Amino acid sequence: MIARAALACFAALLLAGCVALPPQTAALQARPPADLPARTERAEVPFFAQTRDHCGPAALATALADIGLPADPDRLADAVFLPSRAGSLQIEMLGGARRQGAVATRLPRELEALLREVAAGHAVVVLQNLGLDWLPRWHYAVVVGYDLAERELVLRSGTDKRATISLRTFEYTWARGGRWAITVLPPDKLPAMATEADAQEAAVGFERAAPPAQAALAYRTLLARWPGNLLAGIGLGNTLNAAGDTAGARAAFETVTERHDSAVAWINLARLRLDAGDAAGARTAAERAVQRADAAEPAWRDMARTTLAATNAR
């Protein structure tokens, strides 16, 4: 009797959870954003049916193919699928996209952000938990459309090329998956809804996997939206230098030092000027590096002084 009562109570809780609208869905339905299209679907997004537990490789292949990059789920499985986990971890999905030449960027944990990203023309890879918190069943899918009037999303999911799911159900499953969502885009494009911090993290991660010239393009793209981003400015200078464009690297670090009093930027500028035969300009930059390091960035003090000594030796 006690067991039956407990089971009945548990069932009632589940039913109550399914009936109630989750908060973000409720907000969207109560106050649909006036500037958000009521319906969008990108029917042209490719589809790769999932095989075995390979929803991660299939979803990643879908996103890569959508931007014209090589997309073979079987080959991607070798890179992102972990047999011991019978699935793909988020970090493997990010790395797999970057190794294929795409910038994978985290999106805000908001349902509206997903809809706006799709409205901007970008497929969105999401992680759902189709089970329960204590009995998870992880699943990757790709959001390719939505209909606010019908209150549903359109997904590339599993073996279904056009799976529809209610906003309510999706939010429950997405929330249980940590509200994880990414865009997979070429380095000359940014997600519509990414924050500066997430775009910066994505560019830095891309640099670790991409050729220097492609990484430089990603930093240029980020700087076009956030021109004052210090890390992106330094990253642009470093990747241009690694790509052999020393003149471009010097120009990049000159721009950084015009915006920021950064010891590492001054050090890099001094070295590039020295390599170009501009001893006087190098010395000026090195002196600024020492001043900044002494004043606020002691971690760079030794390198700044070493750089200054090198300029004095010329």
Label the predicted regions.
Residues L14-G17:
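C-terminal motif of bacterial Sec signal peptides marking the signal peptidase cleavage site
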Residues A232, A265-W266, A299-W300:
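TPR alpha-solenoid repeat register
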Residues V19-A27, A149-G235, N241:
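Noncatalytic regulatory segments and standalone regulatory/sensor domains
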Residues V103, L107-R156:
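Active-site-adjacent substructure of cysteine-protease-like catalytic cores
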Residues V19-E110, L114, A120, D188-K189, ...:
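Cysteine-nucleophile protease catalytic domains, especially the papain-like/related folds used
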Residues G235, N268, D302-M303, T307:
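Canonical tetratricopeptide repeat
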